[in-house]
Curated annotation (Swiss-Prot):
The keyword Cytoplasm does not apply. It catalyses: 5-(2-hydroxyethyl)-4-methylthiazole + ATP = 4-methyl-5-(2-phosphooxyethyl)-thiazole + ADP + H(+). One of its GO terms (molecular function) is hydroxyethylthiazole kinase activity. This is Hydroxyethylthiazole kinase. The gene is thiM. Keywords: ATP-binding, Kinase, Magnesium, Metal-binding, Nucleotide-binding, Thiamine biosynthesis, Transferase. NCBIfam families: PRK09355.1, thiM. Its EC number is 2.7.1.50.
Length: 267
């Protein structure tokens, strides 16, 4: 286990809880409630706002913005472009979750437009989404990964060079990449794939940690460590997806330094 990542994760979790950062989310209908509750459970303060008339104001008052393209329409894409441009102009953390990248032309176009508006400090997705974000060669099965996280590492490194930011590839092992830096988090549980929106939750947590930790690589690594450990804690209480969702929120709320020390599997 990496003692460096262990120390950082404990410190960054305390920062989130002590500062309770406002995190602006333009996210999808499917996960809004779960995402907001997860942010509250970890100690952050969520704002869920997508109206184009107010996104610039929301970006301005919040400490980070998370853009999630799960349920798209043209007005939403315009809001995302506007929010991305504003976040970059203010030098604030911007997280992009390219949900279902490669599944449709509108998703691919939306990703290009958002990237043109402003490079995110963190991009988080599964292997297929990361592959398709950089090129059209990845194949997407709905919004679930059909590629292993390992298979997307080189593409993730290339995407990091394009954006100048961090790329997180979620999977059985999570890879966090920026330039020549790479961290691996091997926590979590397979039951997490049976609850919709936990990938979206991971992106929101990246936003919360990025809001309080200037080192975006460190912030993303800490967020993914917390995500995986909370998943293991939830699985220890239930073996079914319905109760797992509730147990996961409880785990985020109850997570402490001792549990992180016991469970973290990172390098």
């Amino acid at each position: 286990m990496s003692q460096h990542i262990l120390k950082n994760t404990i410190e960054d979790l305390e920062l989130v809880r002590s500062k309770s950062p406002l995190v602006h989310n333009i996210t999808n209908y499917v996960v809004m409630n779960n995402t907001a509750n997860a942010l509250l459970a970890i100690g952050a303060s969520p704002i869920m706002a997508h109206a184009i008339e107010e996104v610039e104001e929301m970006v301005t008052i919040c400490s980070a913005t998370v853009i999630n393209i799960g349920t798209l329409s043209e007005p939403w894409i315009q809001s995302m472009e506007k929010a991305a441009k504003k976040a970059v102009s203010l030098g604030k953390p911007l997280v992009l979750d390219p949900v279902g990248a490669g599944a449709s032309n509108i998703r691919n176009a939306a990703i290009r437009r958002i990237l043109d508006a402003g490079n995110p400090t963190i991009v988080r997705g599964n292997a297929s989404e990361i592959l398709s974000t950089l090129s059209s060669s990845g194949k997407t099965k709905g919004v679930d990964a059909t590629d292993s996280s390992e298979s997307a590492v080189e593409t993730g490194k290339s995407l990091s060079k394009v954006t100048g930011g961090v790329v997180v590839i979620s999977g059985a092992t999570d890879f966090i990449l920026k330039g020549t830096d790479m961290a691996q988090i091997s926590n979590g549980d397979a039951l997490m794939t049976k609850v919709t929106g936990l990938g979206c939750t991971a992106s929101a947590l990246c936003g919360a940690f990025a809001a309080v930790q200037k080192d975006q690589f460190r912030a993303a690594t800490s967020a993914m460590a917390v995500m995986g450990i909370a998943g293991e804690m939830a699985k220890s209480k239930t073996a079914s997806p319905g109760s797992f969702q509730v147990a996961f929120l409880d785990a985020l709320y109850e997570l402490n330094a001792d549990t992180i020390k016991q469970k973290l599997n990172a390098k």
